[in-house]
Structures are given as C-alpha cells and as structure tokens.
Amino acid sequence: MSQRKFAGLRDNFNLLGEKNKILVANRGEIPIRIFRTAHELSMQTVAIYSHEDRLSTHKQKADEAYVIGEVGQYTPVGAYLAIDEIISIAQKHQVDFIHPGYGFLSENSEFADKVVKAGITWIGPPAEVIDSVGDKVSARNLAAKANVPTVPGTPGPIETVEEALDFVNEYGYPVIIKAAFGGGGRGMRVVREGDDVADAFQRATSEARTAFGNGTCFVERFLDKPKHIEVQLLADNHGNVVHLFERDCSVQRRHQKVVEVAPAKTLPREVRDAILTDAVKLAKECGYRNAGTAEFLVDNQNRHYFIEINPRIQVEHTITEEITGIDIVAAQIQIAAGASLPQLGLFQDKITTRGFAIQCRITTEDPAKNFQPDTGRIEVYRSAGGNGVRLDGGNAYAGTIISPHYDSMLVKCSCSGSTYEIVRRKMIRALIEFRIRGVKTNIPFLLTLLTNPVFIEGTYWTTFIDDTPQLFQMVSSQNRAQKLLHYLADVAVNGSSIKGQIGLPKLKSNPSVPHLHDAQGNVINVTKSAPPSGWRQVLLEKGPAEFARQVRQFNGTLLMDTTWRDAHQSLLATRVRTHDLATIAPTTAHALAGRFALECWGGATFDVAMRFLHEDPWERLRKLRSLVPNIPFQMLLRGANGVAYSSLPDNAIDHFVKQAKDNGVDIFRVFDALNDLEQLKVGVDAVKKAGGVVEATVCFSGDMLQPGKKYNLDYYLEIAEKIVQMGTHILGIKDMAGTMKPAAAKLLIGSLRAKYPDLPIHVHTHDSAGTAVASMTACALAGADVVDVAINSMSGLTSQPSINALLASLEGNIDTGINVEHVRELDAYWAEMRLLYSCFEADLKGPDPEVYQHEIPGGQLTNLLFQAQQLGLGEQWAETKRAYREANYLLGDIVKVTPTSKVVGDLAQFMVSNKLTSDDVRRLANSLDFPDSVMDFFEGLIGQPYGGFPEPFRSDVLRNKRRKLTCRPGLELEPFDLEKIREDLQNRFGDVDECDVASYNMYPRVYEDFQKMRETYGDLSVLPTRSFLSPLETDEEIEVVIEQGKTLIIKLQAVGDLNKKTGEREVYFDLNGEMRKIRVADRSQKVETVTKSKADMHDPLHIGAPMAGVIVEVKVHKGSLIKKGQPVAVLSAMKMEMIISSPSDGQVKEVFVSDGENVDSSDLLVLLEDQVPVETKA
C-alpha cells in the first residue's frame, strides 16, 4: 500500500491552480500566520531564515525553508533586508508569490518592484502605490488631494537638523520626528521644550536606517493625549475598495502598540463614519490595491487627522478577523492572484462586525525595568486556550533561546466575545493561564493595564502608559514551582550549601506528628478543634500589668518552653526551620496550653533565618502565631541593639519592637550584654510604647558565691533595683553559661523574692555543667514564678534543663499546670527532629563542669566549637576554652552574652590561631591588628562595662585609631530615615512592608542577600527539611504545599552528564506530571570561560548595559570628564537604539567595550572615578 503525504491532501481543494507556491519574506509569527492560510488555500509554502534563526519555528512550519546567504554574510537583521538574495532564492525554487509580512521589507518599493520584474507575484500594493503612501510625506500630499485633514508637519522629508529647528520655531513644541518609512515605533522621537532636537534627530534617523534601510525623516506637530484609530482596508485590482471597520490602537509605549481593540469602544458614531469614509476615499484616490491600513489621530474635541497609510498587513489584523469573520491574509493572496472583491463575496454593505476583540502582545520585556527586553532560555512555556482565545505565536516553547537580535514578541493573544467587558475578562483569564518561565515577560503589566479603570472605560489615549505610573504597581507572577526546582537541582548537583552542615540527616523520612489523647483516651483532632485557652487570653483581655499580677498569683511555678528558640540554638546551631515548627505547632497549642510562654523568636534566630535558612523571620512569626493563638510568645531583645550585634538609633529599636508586637510577640525579654542600664532602658521603653509585656533582665555571670568575684549578690540586687525602677512587668534572670549553682540560685532568688514580693521572677539557664535541673528546682522552691525548660529530646548539654526531669523534681511540692502525657507525646516528634538535624550537632558527649572556669554561654559553646573546627583549631579545643577565659579577663571580666560573648570568642580564637598568651597580647597590644568586634568593644559601641574598661590595655588596642565613647552609643547615632529606607527598598525589591524595613535596619547586607536568594529560589521554607538539606534520590517523590489547596508533586528523574564546555549538568524533574529540565553549574568542575564583569546597578560609578544587544557607539574614553545624564554609549537591541547615560558626575576610569561589541544585560560598560568634572568653555 503506497504511503501518501499529508501535504498531498491539499490537492483536493486547490483554489489557485498551478501558481500556488508562496514565499514569506519575514520571520517569527507572521510567516506562520500566512503559511496557515496558504495551506488552507492548497499552496506550497517556503520560508527563509537567517543563520541566527536556523532553529526558529517559522522555518519548521513551511514546506520548504532556505537560509539567506552564507554564515556571516549578513547581520541577523540584514539577512531579512537582502533584496537580491531573497529574490534569488524565490527564483531558484520556482516561487509564484512573495508575501512580505510586516516590518523588514514590507514597505520597500524597490523590493516590490524587483519582485514583479522577476516574474513573481507581489502580495501587496504595487511599488508606485507604496511610494505614494508608504512614504509618510507623500501620504500627506495624498491627503491634501483627497481633502482629508492632517496634522501640521514639514511639507517633505528633511535631511538636516536646521530644517527640524525651523519647523519647531514656526509651530512650537512639542513635535515628533518620525521615520518616513516603517513603523513599530522605531525611528520616532518626541521632542518637548528644552529637549535636545539635534540628538533626537540623529537617533531617529540612525534607528530608521538600521530598521528599514532608509533614514529619511519628517517632523510634525505632536498632539497630546489623542486616540490612535486605524481602519483596515481591502482593495482589488479593479478599483473596488472596502473597509473592515476600525481598531483602537491607542494603548502604546514608545509609539509601539501594546494592546489593540476592535472596534473602538468610545468613538462617537459620526466620528467613526467620517473616519471610515475618509479611509476609503484615500484608498481610491491613490489607486490602492491589496490590504492596507489608514491611520488617524482623534483629539480631545473628536477631530480626526490622517497620519499615514500602512501598505501592508498589520500585527493586529487578527482582531479585525475576529469581529468580521474575514480572513485578511486569504483575501490578500487571492486579490494578488487576480480575484475581485465581489468574487470574494466582499461587499461593503454585507461586511458587519460582531462583538469585540482585544489583542495583547506578550513580549519578553521587563516592565519594572522600563520594558527592558530580556534574553535567555525559556524554561517553561504553557499557553492559554479555550473559548474565544486565539494565539498567534512564533518562537514560543520550552527550550527557546530568546536572542537580542530580533523583536521581543513571543505570542499575540487575541480574545473575542459579545461585549467589551466579556472580552476584557476573557483576556485577563487567558493571561493568567500563561506560564512562561526563564525570561521576564510583560504579562504582569498587561494584567495591571486591563484592570485599570481607564482601560475598563475604554477612554485611553496614546500616552496613557507614560501618563499613568500606577500601571507599574504590578502583581508579579510568583514563579514558585520553577524557583524551587532550581534550588532542588542545585542541591542535586552540588549538595547542600547551608553553612555549618556536616554530612546528611540521619532521618530518612519526615518526622511523624504525634496524636494527643484526652482524659478518656480519645484522639484530639488538633487541626479542627480550637486549643484550650491559655495565658495569652489573659494578656489579651486584661493587658500586661494584670497579666503579670495573675502570673505572680499563680499557685505554683510556670514553665516556659525554649525548644522553638534557645534549645535548638544551643544544640543545632539555630538551624531548625519554620516548616518543622509549623508542623508541630497545632499539637503544641493543645499539649502546652498551660505553659507560661513559648520562646520562639528574636536573638540569633532572626538573622540565622535569613542568613542560613533563607527564610523570612517575620513570616515565621506570623505563621506560628496563627497556629498557636493561646500561648504567649516570648522573644529575646538585645536592648539598644534590637536583634543586631551593635547599637542602633533609638527610632530603629522603637520601629522594630512595634512590628514584633504587631506580628505576634507578647513578652519581650529585654537584656543588655553588659547590664548597661542606659542601653537596657532603650529596649524597655520601646516595649512599653508598643504595648508588650516587659521582662527586663539581669544577665548572670560566673560563680556568685566565690569570694572576691566581681559579680556578687550585692551587684545583682543593685541592678535589679534599678530595673524595677524602670517599671518592668517581670524581672528576668538570664544565666547564659549555666554557672548558677543551686545554692546561688536559692540565695539570689530568695533575696529578690523577699525584696519584691509582688513582682514575677523568671529565670533562664543552660545545662552545660549538668546542674540546671537542681538549680531551677532551687529557684522554684525559692519563689521563682517562671523557669525555662526544653522538651526532653532537646534538653541537656548546652540547652535548657529537661522538662520531665524538672517536673519530677518538683512533684509533690509545686504545681506547674502541665499534662505530662502530652509532653511525652510531643517529645516523640522532637526525638525524630533531632535526627533530622543531626548534621548540625556539635560533638558534645556530656556536661562540661569546666564551664564554671571558662564561663562560655551555652548557645555560644556549640557555635564556638564549630568555628574552631572550621578554622582548623578543632584539635586545640581545650586550648580555645582556656584562651576564652584569658580573653575574658583581658577585656575586664565582662558579662558574657551576645554580643559581648562574641567579642570574647573572637579574641580567644585570635589568640589561639596566632599562638599568643594573655601576656603576649598585653605586651603587643599596640602593634596587633585585633578583630573588629574587639575594636568595637573598646571603642564603646557595645556599651559601658561594669567597673569600666581595663587601662592601659584599652588605649593600646585603640592606638588613636578610634574614639573612646563614654556615653550610650545610640546618642551618637543619627535617627534612621525610615521613609527613605522604605522607598529605597521598594525601588530595589518591589513590594515591601514595615517588617522589611525593620529587617534591613537590623542587618542590611543579610537582608539584601536574603532578597537575592528569594528572587532566585523563592520561598524555601515550604520545602520538607530532608529535601532542603540533602539531594533527592532518583525517582524520589515529594509533596510541597505552597499555599492552601496548592500542592506540588515533585519527582527527581535524572541528573545528566557534565557538559564539559559549559560546566553544567541538566537535572530532570517531573512536576505535577510534566517534565521540567533545569541547567545547573557543577561547582566541583573548573571550566575556563571568558566572562565580562557585571555592573552593580546600585553603584553610581558603575555604568552597565540595561539589556543584551550590540554597542553601536562608545561616546567616552578613559580619562573623560562627564556629567550626570551625559551619554556614554549607544546600544542597539531588539531592533531599537537607546542612549546609555551616566548616572553621576565623574571621570572615566575604564571603558570595557568597543563599537560593534555584543553585550549581555548588566555587563559593565564603563567604570567611573568619583571626581567632579571640570567646567569647560565653549
């Protein structure tokens, strides 16, 4: 049985006879559009393509395809302007028709003439008609003959700047310099009063010459806020002309249409009729043939002015087809073949419109960066569809590489329906349905535009986009799935990059959430039933003062659980993620409903969340708060430091605390690392202003009972007295190193209870020495109202004492209000969690009684051990602990808690790594380069230590390099300009809130890095922890809930071989049943590649390429003195030119590019030196 080709089926409906081979002299979506109609007409189709377009879709849609010239013979654009080469291809392959599409040679009369002379049928108006209307100046003369109104302009083309200036002098500003040939917004420049006419003229002519091969321009009066209305025309070879009604093309940017509507929604009937009549009149006057478009402007008084006739098919012809049902391309081809309009059934009185249609051009442009065209590889492409949705696309599919050589349009989306509003909503739906990943698109902008009240009313004008900055307040596509895949792919290739991780988690599955049981043994449904009321309800109903009073009146000792903060800080390097806290949160809300509080925020957890876990600490707080509404949340606040490591302006602390209170923190444990009361008061006052519970805290240090100790009972009672005078709700005692022995606990708490019988006392310790259970038992028996504990599996060593051990110690003496069975059920979860985070465990085997000598805080002990191992000092751990003790005394025997503990630790490691004794340090102090933290301490930036700074050691260390502060550091700091910070963050990172401002104030660089990480990988907190910390195994499937009701099913399919040229591997995933491919650089491989330096777009001395393209002209050289706004280079990209200007005054230090060089987006072009240019005389 013989095999028939699909193409042979066309012979059954051949309409054009033997002449049926058509070549489209164009690229992208328009050849595809034409090929489809040609195939319907049983024609054979031929595509042409440049070397750069050899993978383009239009080449594949044709029956035959031929490259234009040899490799390197033409530029990417120049290939499609090579008239003789294109005609030669047509002749060689027996082409009968040539369709020019739009752009390129579509309005070139020379091309039309040569096509006809070559014996090929030209689909379009003849050359003489193109000359009479395609040239905008000739078209004005035509309008005068037809008595159709036009906008005042030069009578003919101009060749010099002086002619442009003469027109400006006669008619005034504003004017527009326009290319006499072509369209699409290229070769156009609006010049307003004060603008540089000469520069605009030069750019317009240069751009026109590049785009259309002809730089001729003319000047005309520029109308403010007009509508742009165009009429679709069809004319045959027998003098018949019809119009297919109008399109409203007023929504434009850079004179290039963005959204088109047919018919015009708000055009009065009499104006529409006059425009349609004039359009037909113009076509008949010039003897027009084939398809064309008459374009008009309509001013605010509904006066219309003829602009030009475009002698070609338009990009937006699709929406006219949708409302009339007429295939314009089919009409073009058949008219060129000799058919008359009547033969095609096209009578004016029979042509009607039905409903409305809207077209949106989806481009790879970034609206947030002034519509900068984006380049790169499309990773994901999923298009819209359904009733009333038409797509006309070109190179739009997964894997497409978007180059800088051609127009940035991916696809035209046209929607049609019975009313304007129905179509608008349909278009919104269609745009939302698109999924395009890997390159930026203008879809977020289009959605904002379609929902703007002006667009809804249909009253837009040609500069509507430029005049409406609200359009740029866009809701961006989140691209969550693709970003997560990039992270998982990176981990699959390179492993985890989380600092501090050693090896992989020991737990190979997700921890199981335990079931709680009520008194009757029934399982409690913690997700459906509200948790029991707790102490937070008392706080919310009665306020901080009454809350504190009721805590004091409680008949027993309350417990605060530190598992969510200090416990994992002390044992697991603060690495426990929001995902795992949120998983157990509903269960915790039921199990620990009677708990005084959960310590869950602040301190090191704040910056570690951003710095290492790539999470937003505010999102963690809000999420946990929503899941645990009944138990108070407590945070750690470092007085005048907030959660930073040094003092900040007072207004930054006030601002931060307010955000913390508003987002869920109830109790603020406020401390100062030196017990500096002036520093402490800043935090206390901030909490009072915010309406939180103040737990002003005394930091405990050393062995209080040892004779001669600096920090004795009298010292603590004196500090406590001053804290009480500040008006604290609760008095906190913070034993950071766990050096409070049971006897000291009994004495101190007993003394405080006797002195302050009505004040709640809250004690915190660490179990580093193994005595914490005994110490906290002593505190409780001595009258402490609250003591800190941790879940059993997260207790002991450098963490807090075990809750069950403490309950056993207090049993029969003091009530805690805790359900022991519920605690055991919770503990099962945390036992598994400990295994999940085993890769962050410190190598501590048991208690360290030496803590009474070195006094290293519990949270720091594990971190210091890790740092020592990272610095190669792990084998010298005993020496490090000894050095820590010596460093403490060098600094004056200070209270050690973040950030002062870091100062001691840095100095200790400095001593060990440089093999220095304390005597060496004292002797060489005036010549050693100490760590910055030590310098900050001695300058006084952390505060004033009890007993003062040690002299002359302080002076030797500072060596007049730094001042000696004697007052509170915050008094020396200027208040932050919060409004300016907010505005700067908004400009850099988009949608920000007050919490972002607070994060930036605390940790500017960390916040910036976090935002960059989130932009790259999205919200990583949704990933299961095993997948976050370790590579997926092949065929392993995980579920990722990105929001309620949206779950991603991700399976790793394979990791590809190394591409030795690029150093990349391809990682294949199955995402919700759809294959995704991610390219990842293998960082274990060294690949020699030539890369250009990238500009820091926030550095005014860096001038970078705003988009990928070709440098047309470099206007400066090394040593040039330039001013802000002065052009430094001209870039050609996406068939348009733009001037790159200097963002600041300066002198050119280096130029990194030359004329004709290709550049990528953000490539560093020019580097400036910070020097004000010298004024020169003319």
Swiss-Prot record:
Its main location: cytoplasm. The modification N6-carboxylysine is found at K734. The gene is PYC1. Homotetramer. The active site is at R312. Pyruvate carboxylase catalyzes a 2-step reaction, involving the ATP-dependent carboxylation of the covalently attached biotin in the first step and the transfer of the carboxyl group to pyruvate in the second. Pathway: Carbohydrate biosynthesis; gluconeogenesis. Signal peptide: none annotated. InterPro entries: Aldolase_TIM, ATP-grasp, BC-like_N, Biotin_BS, Biotin_carboxylation_dom, Biotin_COase_C, Biotin_lipoyl, Carboxylase_cons_dom. The modification N6-biotinyllysine is found at K1135. A divalent metal cation binds at D566, K734, H764, H766. SUPFAM superfamilies: Aldolase, Glutathione synthetase ATP-binding domain-like, post-HMGL domain-like, PreATP-grasp domain, Rudiment single hybrid motif, Single hybrid motif. This is Pyruvate carboxylase 1. It is found in: Cytoplasm. Residues 18-470 form the Biotin carboxylation domain. Its cofactor is biotin; Zn(2+). It is an enzyme of class 6 (ligase). Substrate binds at R565, D566, A567, H568, Q569, R638, T898. It catalyses: hydrogencarbonate + pyruvate + ATP = oxaloacetate + ADP + phosphate + H(+). GO terms for biological process: gluconeogenesis; pyruvate metabolic process. Its EC number is 6.4.1.1.
